Regions:
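Class I (Rossmann-like) S-adenosyl-L-methionine-dependent methyltransferase catalytic domain
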Residues: 3, 26, 91-116, 122, ...
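Conserved short histidine dyad/triad with adjacent acidic residue
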Residues: 14-33
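Short acidic-glycine-tyrosine-enriched beta hairpin
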Residues: 53-70
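A short acidic, Gly/Pro-enriched loop at the edge of an enzyme's catalytic core
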Residues: 177-185
């Protein structure tokens, strides 16, 4: 039940009368990985058979019946007046992808959820809002900034639709001029697009505007001897460089590992180079 309580409804199907129930549900169906189905009988009686061939008879009094991802099931109306409804649920990390077709929340942001407590967060270079909206859905008080006014407008519109406690602002990411303090600052795939001479100031500004005990999460491209970065990013971290900027902070996670872009080389293979991922905690006051 705890897992189900952490799920979010991203699609509600129309109610189906007995003779309208799709053939796919009668013959046998399974929803994709990461998709839970909530089955409700609105009236009448329904026979539900799941993967283990165990059958149960459901009525309106039974309330919600959750069907796990990739679990085969069939339904059979037992009365002519049967009416049912299906709603689809997913975890927070997949919600905006499934509901709005956005890019998935960055995996590093999802992983940090197990370490970083809910608080006041800043998403630097929010783009379409894949990380900021996820954090808002998880209960963070979120400020999202980007230098693209259209992106800022889109994030604000989605936040309003979803009733999230967040706001998006237009901001020059090279400015190193944050105006508030935060418990958590996220910058995924952002530093590689900054002007190199502003990077030290931007990092120092992030650090200065992180509350004691707060966290910074950075993911960015690298250029190393073993894997030179062929992409024309304005800035790329060198081996160990990002860690040095955070000397004196507690390193919760640090890794330099191969990643791939959507871009491909002349042979049609994904272009690979290293990315640095670092989650670090500011010392307590």
């Amino acid at each position: 039940m705890d897992e189900q309580m952490a799920l979010f409804c991203y699609q509600e199907m129309p109610a189906w009368q007995a003779d309208e129930i799709p053939d796919a549900l009668r013959a046998g169906h399974a929803f994709d990985e990461g998709e839970w189905a909530c089955l409700n009988v609105l009236q009448g009686r329904l026979k539900l058979t799941e993967a283990d061939n165990a059958s149960v008879e459901l009525t309106a009094e039974d309330g919600d019946h959750m069907i796990a991802p990739q679990q085969q099931f069939t339904v059979e109306p037992l009365t002519d007046d049967t009416e049912i409804k299906l709603s689809l649920y997913c975890a927070a990390k997949d919600y905006f992808n499934k509901k709005y077709g956005m890019s998935a929340t960055h995996s590093a942001v999802v992983a940090a959820e197990n370490i970083v407590p809910v608080g006041k967060a800043l998403d630097m270079g929010c783009g379409q809002g894949r990380n900021a909206l996820f954090l808002g859905l998880k209960g963070f008080d979120v400020t999202a900034v980007d230098n693209n006014p259209q992106a800022v407008q889109n994030v604000n519109e989605l936040a309003h639709i979803e009733g999230l406690d967040m706001r998006a602002l237009e901001y020059d990411l090279n400015a190193a001029n944050l105006q508030d303090h935060f418990d958590y600052i996220v910058a995924t795939v952002v530093f590689m697009f900054l002007h190199p001479r502003f990077v030290p100031q931007v990092i120092a500004d992030m650090q200065a505007h992180t509350n004691p005990g707060g966290y910074n999460l950075i993911v960015s491209a690298m250029d190393t001897e073993d894997f030179p970065c062929p992409m024309p990013f304005p800035f790329k971290f060198k081996e160990g460089e990002l860690r040095e900027y955070y000397r004196g902070w507690e390193i919760a996670e640090y890794k330099e590992e191969l990643g791939a872009m959507h871009a491909k080389d002349a042979a049609g293979n994904p272009i690979q180079f290293k990315f640095v991922t670092m989650l670090t905690k500011k010392p307590e006051a």
